[in-house]
């Protein structure tokens, strides 16, 4: 096998676009997405996800297309499509199936004198999916045999949206493939952009499992801190003081309790529990952690109602402002946002619930309260956008005299509210 002379990235979302741009600086690269509008916008230098600057896109040599034929003769194909869950929390492999079928169709038309292409999957999934689900689809559509006519590989994405410190270049890349030779080639390709280095897993299933457990671990740790924060609250203990004290021990790992949303941490555990069930194992601890984090919206809603009543007021006579609607801070991604779920839940009990997020459109439901000097009975800091956390005093000023400030982000120091008459509560 030879080192590939070109790369095609299938799927230009939050993961695929930065990846394709990085490779384009090193080797001829095509970025494919079946969303023609997405391609048109990118050709104009517009990333609707607000992750990549316009000048970076327009200055790149990346070839952008929605034409499937671009995949046909590529030597190295990388798949970065989303892998969500269904409404009943089962793996939703629809996009993975579609991408695999498309690649198979295109490989059927491949020139016979070209070497077997390497097809790398980066999408998070359960152990065995690449070889047992994706591979057979490509075989069926292409008429080629996996491991001969094309080579499967897996290198889990480790993108942390909005994080300028942990990037493609600074995070070790895990790679794997059907053969040792192919794994070596995959590693050499990724070393071009992964300056932190490459870790070669012994097989594809191991690499798949490594990605899933990364997010399962984080989900469980946050669940532990969420549950203990609620316990300590009932005891009248400030959980942040508890965690700070415990953190003085060298082997205590600290996490911030809060809402767990998005398309990775609250999704990936279900891929592992699904796979566990297929081999006859009930993953009770993982599912318990998921239950804790999924129930935080309702628990916080009830807690705020309790705070309002303790102040002598009624929720149905209370006006609320929720700051932040994306699933995490400083990212323009609203998918599976628990802040949005909290908004819906509180709208059932409170007189009015307004929201503001700097990453949302400037419509009637997203008016900047800082510009109109509005005041609210309850202000909930749900997402720690820099616009909010850099001006906590302005957030405090949004609360009416004797009102309530709720911090779900851990960004507000209690001392910042000491000189006011408002009631302050945080996880």
Task: Outline where the language-model segments fall.
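Structural/interface elements that position substrates and couple domains in central-metabolism enzymes
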Residues: 1-427
